[in-house]
Amino acid sequence: MGQKVNPYGFRLGITTDHVSRWFSDSTKKGQRYSDYVAEDVRIRTMLKTSLDRAGVARIEIERTRDRVRVDIYTARPGIVIGRRGVEAERIRADLEKLTGKQIQLNILEVKNPEAEAQLVAQGIAEQLAGRVAFRRAMRKGLQGAQRAGAKGVRIQVSGRLGGAEMSRSEFYREGRVPLHTLRANIDYGFYEARTSFGRIGVKVWVYKGDITNKDLAREQANQKSSRPERRNDRSDGRTGDRRTNAPRTAPAAEAAPVAAAGVEA
C-alpha cells in the first residue's frame, strides 16, 4: 500500500497538514465547497505556469470570509518578488482578478532546496528536456539530496527513456525510504519532462527522518501562532449591552389585576 499511495495523503492528519485550509457549508453560488476547490486548482495552475523558473516547492492556500492568503515556498524568492516588488504586485493583481477577493501574498524562501523532493524532480526533468542522459541526471539528483542531509532518496523515471521505442520505468535508491512507516517524514515530488520523444515522468521520495511527538507538537504550535485569532465576543458567557458593558437584567413582572370580591348592589 505504501508503495502506491501518495505519501502526503497517506500521512494526512498524522504527520502532514492540508495545503488548503478553509471550510465551506454554503449553498450559495461562488461559495460552495466545489467552487473553492476549483478556484484552488486555478490558483495553483496559474502560479506554477507563471513561476516555472522560480523553483516553487509548494503553494499553501488559506481562506477567511473575504480574504485569501497564498503562501509561496520558493528557492528563488528574488524572481518571484522582482525588482522593487513589481513582480509580486503583478502576481497579486492577477490573483485578485482571478478570485475577485482580496489577496494576501506571502513569499517564503526554501532554506535547503537540494533536499526538497519537488525541486529535485523539477531539476531532473529540466536536465532530461536538455538531452542529458537519464541515469546521469538521476545520480546527480541522488548525490545532491544526500549532501543536503537526506537520510534516504528514491528517484523513479518513466517513459521512453533514451528514445527507446517501448516505454519503461527505472529507479535508483540510496539509504532508507520507509514508505509504510507513518511517523517517517517523507517528502514527495512529481514533475513531467517534455522531450522530443514524449513526456517522461519523474517521481522523487526524500526521507528526512522520523517525526517525534515533540516535533509534531512544535509544528502545530507554530501553525496556530501564525494564523490570525478569531473574534469571540461572548467567550466568557456574559450577556449585556456591548456599548456600556453593563449586565442586562430581566424586566420586572407586572402585577396581575385582582378581581373585585363583592358585587355592586
From Swiss-Prot:
Region annotation Disordered: residue ranges?
Answer: 217-265
List, as start-end ranges, the regions of compositional bias called Low complexity. Answer: 250-265
Q: Which GO terms describe its cellular component?
A: cytosolic small ribosomal subunit
Q: What are the Basic and acidic residues biased-composition ranges?
A: 226-244
* Gene3D superfamilies per record: 3.30.300.20, Ribosomal protein S3, C-terminal domain
PROSITE patterns, alphabetized = KH_TYPE_2 (PS50823), RIBOSOMAL_S3 (PS00548)
Taking every annotated instance into account, which residue ranges of this chain make up the domain KH type-2? 43-111
Q: Name one GO biological process term.
A: translation
Q: Name one GO molecular function term.
A: rRNA binding
Keywords for this entry? Answer: Ribonucleoprotein, Ribosomal protein, RNA-binding, rRNA-binding
Asked whether the keyword Ribosomal protein is assigned, the reply is yes
Transmembrane in keyword set: no
Top-rank taxon: Bacteria
Relate the protein's function as given in its record: Binds the lower part of the 30S subunit head. Binds mRNA in the 70S ribosome, positioning it for translation.
For this protein, the record's NCBIfam families field holds: rpsC_bact
Q: How does it assemble?
A: Part of the 30S ribosomal subunit. Forms a tight complex with proteins S10 and S14.
Q: What is this protein called?
A: Small ribosomal subunit protein uS3
